[in-house]
């Protein structure tokens, strides 16, 4: 998977809208666009990773121990993951050389997941 493919996936997610709150923003659309610019500046060359559960309820998550999960962005030691098979995004911490633990939920809303 290339960065160009990731950009297309991000644009498709953006086109669906976002549920992410922008409390206090006078121009919500401008804030969303600013968030996307910031995300694009943090894109990395996608690489496949292993995702492990941080706690028992995550063990059934669509990211845990599944193939085709890639890192697509990184900022402040937090990583944005994308599941090629489920087409969902999730934020994670790096817990090993090629091992990541989810911070929370996964959705198809790239903006909500990137903002955490």
Region spans (language model):
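Compact, glycine/acidic-enriched structural inserts
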Residues: 93-116
């Amino acid at each position: 998977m290339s960065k160009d493919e990731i950009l297309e996936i991000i644009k498709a997610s953006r086109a669906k809208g976002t549920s992410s709150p922008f409390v206090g923003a006078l121009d919500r659309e401008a804030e969303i666009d600013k968030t996307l610019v910031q995300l694009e500046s943090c894109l990395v060359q996608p690489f496949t990773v292993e995702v492990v559960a941080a706690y028992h309820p995550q063990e059934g998550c669509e990211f845990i121990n599944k193939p085709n999960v890639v890192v697509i962005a990184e900022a402040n030691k937090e990583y944005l993951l994308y599941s090629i098979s489920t087409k969902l995004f999730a934020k994670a911490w790096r817990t090993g050389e090629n091992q990541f633990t989810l911070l929370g939920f996964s959705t198809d809303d790239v903006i909500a997941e990137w903002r955490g």
